[in-house]
Regions:
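Consensus "Asn ladder" position of solenoid repeat domains
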Residues: 349, 370, 391, 412, ...
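Conserved hydrophobic beta-strand positions in leucine-rich repeat
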Residues: 316-321, 344-346, 363-367, 384-388, ...
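N-terminal glycine/threonine-rich, aromatic-flanked beta-hairpin/loop signature
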Residues: 62-110, 114, 181-227, 231
Length: 520
């Protein structure tokens, strides 16, 4: 009796356990249905988020040109990067983080999106996944309206590195190992932030020269995978692919698994050293004026369309004076990117504004005969030469420019100018403005002074003469040929100037001016 009881008790326990297990399984599958592979849909959805690179195909390592990178986001969006030749379509694809969407049902992953106006779909079965590796079977895809069946087992590794910013800069190859046909110790590559690059070779003298026969030079980095393409003028597009093994401490290592026509394989590796960072491009974004860009690119430091940090440190002069047959520059925007500038020489253009507040080392500015209406010089304390003759200035602040020796602001629309703090002033021209008074600095070095075609007279002329230093020189004070001349200097004031060593001169005749018999 006892044995029978024990048997029934055991049987009940087993049935209860089975019932509980069945209930648990059913409850679990309602929330997290089992997939044919034994994986749960929820687990796949959780673990697939991130960046994955295809590395094996049917158990064999994929050559580098067959790699691609997929990045899955938690919201069902994804990107797909590839640069692959499709034999059945006889064309390359160039996908730089192309946007797609994805969905997961059971263990079936569907990727879809529009490319070139066509719906693209691909279907995979996830057979295994963890946080480092994933296995999928690529079953079929729809491309250009055609359906293609596949039975391709693809292995993926999770990509944690992102070298898309680290690669930007100028790199020089230092070492190469692998196939002889890839041997190259004579190359520089400049990777730019806009997805283009520049290729350089050494000439016979050992100088680096830009290879300028290429119409296209593009690249992208997705994670640790680099794809490049280029096209020689009149030639076909070329493609190349690399795994970036590391970028660290100014050194970059690439590797690529290649396959020969006979099916044998080899690995090529390159080691690069970083020569310099890229400071900026000579492009429309940084330099909106096309002629200014052209003039910059005529200089050695910018002839390849970019400026490195190393080159930037040596740029202290920008010369772009207008010459016959050249377009006039309308804007010098971008000049603020040159912090080492000491000289800007750009007379004879149509410049309307000039921002030099970031060029604190400037010593000389010449933008004569342009269309500048205002200029901020408060951040340029080292200026010693300033030529703004022939512009449209109505005011100017020189309070932070005490080192000026030569100051030319003639032929503007100034109603006032204060130069009293400029103690080293040697040459000063402020002719053809609307000045009604002018007090000169206490500068014993002052030698050249042109003030004609203004409105200085009477007590203001007395004050001007009183501020003249005692030395022999010439005061260009009147232009008798100008019917609009409003300066007035009397014979008594001419005599007062002469007593200090200054000869009053009529600009029209270049002769001594005797003075007026009346003050107004």
């Amino acid at each position: 009796m006892k044995a029978k009881y024990l048997f029934h008790t055991l049987l009940a326990s087993v049935m209860l356990a089975a019932t509980i297990g069945l209930t648990t399984a059913c409850t679990s599958n309602d929330d997290n249905p089992a997939t044919p592979s034994g994986l749960s849909e929820a687990v796949i959805k959780e673990k697939i988020v991130g960046k994955w690179k295809a590395i094996t195909q049917d158990g064999k390592e994929r050559v580098t040109d067959k790699l691609y990178v997929m990045t899955f986001n938690a919201d069902g969006t994804m990107t797909y990067s590839s640069s692959t030749f499709f034999q059945n379509l006889s064309k390359y694809t160039w996908r730089n983080k192309a946007p797609f969407t994805y969905s997961i049902s059971g263990n079936v992953l569907t990727r879809e999106g529009q490319e070139d106006g066509e719906l693209r779909k691909a279907f995979y079965e996830v057979t295994d996944i963890n946080y480092q590796e994933m296995q999928m079977v690529f079953t079929s895809y729809i491309l250009d309206g055609q359906t293609f069946s596949r039975d391709m087992k693809i292995g993926y590794e999770r990509v944690t590195a992102d070298y898309s910013e680290d690669i930007i800069g100028l790199w020089e190859v230092t070492e190469m190992t692998g196939e002889e046909t890839y041997n190259d110790d004579n190359a520089r590559l400049a990777f730019l932030a806009d997805g283009t690059y520049r290729y350089y070779r050494k000439d016979d003298t050992g100088d680096w020269q830009l290879v300028s026969t290429r119409d296209v030079e593009e690249y992208f980095v997705d994670g640790d995978w680099l794809a490049t393409r280029w096209q020689e003028t009149g030639g076909e597009m070329n493609y190349e692919w690399w795994d970036i093994d590391e970028i660290q401490d100014g050194q970059m290592k690439w590797s690529a698994l290649r396959e020969r026509e006979d099916g044998t394989r080899f690995t090529t590796t390159f080691t690069w050293k970083k020569v310099s960072d890229i400071a900026f491009l000579i492009d429309e974004e940084h330099f909106p004026d096309a002629e200014f860009r052209n003039r910059l690119c005529e200089n050695d430091y910018a002839k390849d369309g970019l400026v490195t940090v190393e080159e930037l440190a040596d740029v202290d002069i920008i010369q772009c004076a207008n010459t016959e047959g050249r377009e006039k520059i309308k804007s010098l925007k971008g000049i603020e990117l040159f912090p080492e500038l000491t000289t800007i020489w750009a007379p004879g253009n149509d410049i309307t504004e000039l921002d030099v507040t970031k060029n604190a080392k400037l010593q000389s500015i010449d933008v004569e005969d342009s269309k500048i209406t205002s200029i901020d010089l408060t951040q340029n304390p080292n200026l010693s030469y300033l030529n703004l003759n022939g512009n449209r200035l109505t005011a100017i602040d020189l309070s932070n420019n005490p080192l000026l020796r030569e100051l030319y602001v003639g032929n503007n629309k100034l109603t006032a100018i204060d130069v009293r703090n400029i103690k080293n002033l040697f040459s000063f021209s402020c002719y053809n403005n609307q000045l009604s008074e002018l007090i000169l600095p206490d500068s014993p070095k002052l030698y050249f002074l042109r003030i004609q075609d203004n409105q200085i007279k009477g007590a203001a002329m007395d004050a001007l003469i009183a501020s003249l230093p005692n030395k022999e020189s010439k005061l260009y004070v009147i232009d008798s040929a100008n019917s609009n001349e409003q300066n007035v200097i009397t014979t008594a004031q001419v005599a007062a100037a002469k007593a200090k060593g200054w000869l009053a001169v009529d600009v029209a005749t270049s002769q001594a001016y005797p003075g007026s018999d009346y003050e107004n």
